[in-house]
Amino acid sequence: MDSDQIIVIEEKNGEAEPASVVAAGPERFINRELSWLHFNRRVLEEAVNPSHPVLERVRFLSISANNLDEFFMVRVAGIKAQVREGITERSPDGLTPAEQLVLINEAVSRLASDQQAIWRDLRGILTEAGIVLLDGRDATKSQRAWIEDHFLHNIFPLLTPLAIDPAHPFPFIPSLGFTIGLQLARVSDGKSMNALIRMPGKIDRFIRLPPNGKDQSVRLMTLEQATSLFIGRLFPGYVVKGQGSFRVIRDSELEIEEEAEDLVRLFETALKRRRRGSVIRLEVDSTMPEELRAFVQRALSTADDEVLLVDGVLAMNELSQLTRVDRPDLEFPPYVPRHPERVRDHGGDIFAAIRKKDLIVHHPYESFDVVVQFLQQATRDPDVVAIKQTLYRTSNNSPIVRALAEAAEAGKSVTALVELKARFDEEANIRWARDLERAGVQVVYGFLELKTHAKLSLVVRREGNTLTTYVHTGTGNYHPVTARIYTDLSYFTSDPIIGRDAARVFNYITGYAEPSDIEKMAVSPLTLRKRMLEHIRGETAFARHGKPAAIWLKMNSLVDPDIIDALYEASRAGVSVELVVRGICCLRPGVPGLSENIRVKSIIGRFLEHGRVYCFGNGHGLPSAKAAVYISSADMMPRNLDRRVEILCPLLNPTVHQQVLEQIMVANLKDTEQSWQLLPDGSSTRMKAAKGEEPFNVHNYFMTNPSLSGRGKSLKESSPRRLTRRSERHQSP
């Protein structure tokens, strides 16, 4: 195979097919931004999934819209900045920033059009189910009277009509700000003017009307439609000649100076600057008159390619508010997470349960309460002398923060690493940091140039004449709310080696001293990349020597070129590579001569797949008791491997090893009901069970089957259904 050959992707009937392939050229990578858009399309496809209740389908539509907003605020904003600065450096797949923008705009245009079409269908289904969205013209006389009364008492006081003239310049519109633009004419002399009405951001988008007699249908009207009915109340003496809504999305990246004496004040200043970031996207109601649209564009300094004309509803992310309607028959049946019985076997003493044996808690199927309990018990336990904790994201009124504060107030040594650079949670984290400092917690902020993304909690307890270290590490945030909908793994252990490694990680973060003696864990940006490459290359060597060789990896994103190239090399050597990648995947699977032994699937369903699990056969194939199995906070992206503090933690206890490898990973690979198979061109197709094989839903399996490490004594009476994988590959339609 010549080193200067490249992958060529040919189009056939609208689908990309590999024509000739090798490893050298940039075409071996899928563009990161386009791969993300493919992922968001998979999310959107769940909004048309007939097996989901209609309010859940609305939720998926809202999620896809919210995802797209953040994509523009962060990714598109960054690429536009590169274009503005004249940067022409190519991405790993060979595209300049300007070329990427063209392809992004084309893909987003199709995606946005499909979102509106899906919403029109869902609106009809909602109407049939008794949830009716009224237009102003649909309202009856009595409904209009009620809306007017509601408007005058609950909306009118919040609105500020803004005439635009030399004395009243165009106001600042915040990111995601929703505004009605107006062309008005004065009744007395016909003089025209432009005006704006900014929609208040602190009230619900949808107004619920009272029931109509015996008809118990839920009737709703949007805030902007209700406002449009009574514009005369805001501009008396004027008539409306034209109107339309618009919404802006601004650059939300933070610019942080490298040198700063006070990191908190630095971030507070940067957050104020972010609120006034440049406009990246302008969404405009397609019914807005062209002259008014041009006026808004000029005022916001937006180019034509930054404007999206919307034939439908703006701010689709707010459709999630419809799911608050009390119609449980139109939602997924409620699910109550299990509490690990093994903790109950020890009278609720989580330290005793961990001392007995390592424990993996699988969220959201098993309750996050056990993580909260771990810290709360440490707070109350007089034998606990020290607690160390990382905080990347957490919830409002966080029980984690409260436990840390109470522990410090009780005289324990408490250290909290609060990451100020957690995107869109910066303000909340500044608030938590100050609350913790007031309680006596030693708060540190880690590295200015690195985000601390590791999930790590360490409790030191005096037991007799010795100190025992209890460790929790996981794949998800210390966030009780998202733990109900994100699939993640929490690992509890009192293994002295893991305890020493965890202490070294904290010392690295607080004291900047690079640890040279970590025993079992790997830590980015120091050793995690090296460990992953060693394992991948190890499987490659096994295959070349005729030994069993297999790699199973589960993550959110696969972007790093070195990791991808190592996986390509493994595939060419004959290693069986199975990847579960929810989001971005820049690797092209199934390409002859490059990646024919690599299969990639993405699972999209009721719960958001968030865990990272990395498994290597170690010369024994998979699954095997001899395999190397890790959980991690890190995805395989350059930022995680090089610009963040992350943890890769081995699972050494046989029970948790078996649980993660033979139960969790096998179930993920076995799933056919919620899985998409990734194709060489970066697109994906829904999977279906192979002929003769029963369909399998991974989320349903874990909702109905106990875990291996958490069952305790009851495992003998209630064992999880054992999973096996057929040798045949799942077939795509």
Swiss-Prot record:
Keywords attached to this entry: ATP-binding, Kinase, Magnesium, Metal-binding, Nucleotide-binding, Phosphoprotein, Transferase
One Gene Ontology term, aspect cellular component: polyphosphate kinase complex
Positions with a binding annotation for Mg(2+): 393, 423
Listed cofactors: Mg(2+)
Active-site residues, record numbering mapped to chain: 453 (phosphohistidine intermediate)
Annotated spans, Disordered: 702-733
Compositionally biased tracts (Basic and acidic residues): 714-733
Catalysis: reaction(s): [phosphate](n) + ATP = [phosphate](n+1) + ADP
Gene3D superfamilies: Endonuclease Chain A (3.30.870.10), Polyphosphate kinase middle domain (3.30.1840.10), Polyphosphate kinase N-terminal domain (1.20.58.310)
Listed GO biological process terms: polyphosphate biosynthetic process
EC number(s) given by UniProt: 2.7.4.1
GO molecular function annotation: ATP binding; metal ion binding; polyphosphate kinase activity
Modification after translation: An intermediate of this reaction is the autophosphorylated ppk in which a phosphate is covalently linked to a histidine residue through a N-P bond.
Protein residues bound to ATP: 67, 486, 582, 610
A Pfam short name: PP_kinase_C
PANTHER family on file: POLYPHOSPHATE KINASE (PTHR30218:SF0)
General function of this protein: Catalyzes the reversible transfer of the terminal phosphate of ATP to form a long-chain polyphosphate (polyP).
Protein name: Polyphosphate kinase
Species of origin: Rhodopseudomonas palustris (strain HaA2)
